[in-house]
């Protein structure tokens, strides 16, 4: 069994546009690939615990990861800890710096979940950073320079030793994501020969 684990971004949900596009495409073109899109908890330590449990549950499977934005940060951590292939899409490289702007009360607009982000949660996020990458060959960076949320240059520098596709223009949502579905499945090794 092949499994694709999709990790959404900050304050997002499994109903994100990219996740839905990929899920529908897989159902049509690779029905043998199971796609898991967990609702990630707002707190990093809870998210890490959930992701570890998913990986351990699928220990015998061929498992690949796709992560977007904050999900790309988690995907990088998971990839390097468990030696799994990952595609990171406009990933957050230093989210522990960005999320200080969100300290205090927050609400996920997709789920309506309210939560309080505290400095200890930022610390939990920081300890998940892997620098330098231990197995850069396991990661493919998909990056658009027109990302209006994150500085694309951070990702290009951090993932310098990884496979990279850097596209001029675009946006944080990653325009034309569907053009990369076949290469993503190939890179993650999820197709059956």
From Swiss-Prot:
Keywords assigned: Hydrolase, Serine esterase
GO terms for cellular component: cytosol
EC number assigned by the record: 3.1.-.-
Species the sequence originates in: Escherichia coli (strain K12)
Transmembrane segments: none
PANTHER family: ESTERASE YQIA, ESTERASE YQIA-RELATED
Its job: Displays esterase activity toward palmitoyl-CoA and pNP-butyrate.
Uppermost EC category: hydrolase
Lineage: Bacteria, Pseudomonadati, Pseudomonadota, Gammaproteobacteria, Enterobacterales
GO molecular function: carboxylic ester hydrolase activity; hydrolase activity, acting on ester bonds
Keyword DNA repair recorded: no
InterPro entries according to UniProt: AB_hydrolase_fold, UPF0227/Esterase_YqiA
Stated name of the protein: Esterase YqiA
């Amino acid at each position: 069994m092949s499994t694709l684990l999709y990790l959404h971004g900050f304050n997002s949900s499994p109903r994100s546009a990219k996740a839905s596009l990929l899920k529908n495409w897989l159902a049509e073109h690779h029905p043998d690939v199971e796609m898991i899109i967990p609702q990630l908890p707002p707190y990093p330590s809870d998210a890490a615990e959930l992701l570890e449990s998913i990986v351990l549950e699928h220990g015998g499977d061929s498992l690949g990861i796709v992560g977007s934005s904050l999900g790309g940060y988690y995907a990088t951590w998971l990839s390097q800890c468990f030696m799994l292939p990952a595609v990171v899409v406009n990933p957050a490289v230093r989210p522990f710096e960005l999320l200080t702007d969100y300290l205090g009360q927050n609400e996920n607009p997709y789920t309506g979940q309210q939560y309080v982000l505290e400095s200890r949660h930022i610390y939990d996020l920081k300890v998940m950073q892997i620098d330098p990458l231990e197995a850069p060959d396991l990661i493919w960076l998909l990056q658009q320079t027109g990302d209006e949320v994150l500085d694309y240059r951070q990702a290009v520098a951090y993932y310098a030793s990884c496979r990279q596709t850097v596209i001029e223009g675009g946006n944080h949502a990653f325009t034309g994501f569907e053009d990369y579905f076949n290469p993503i499945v190939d890179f993650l090794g999820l197709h059956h020969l």
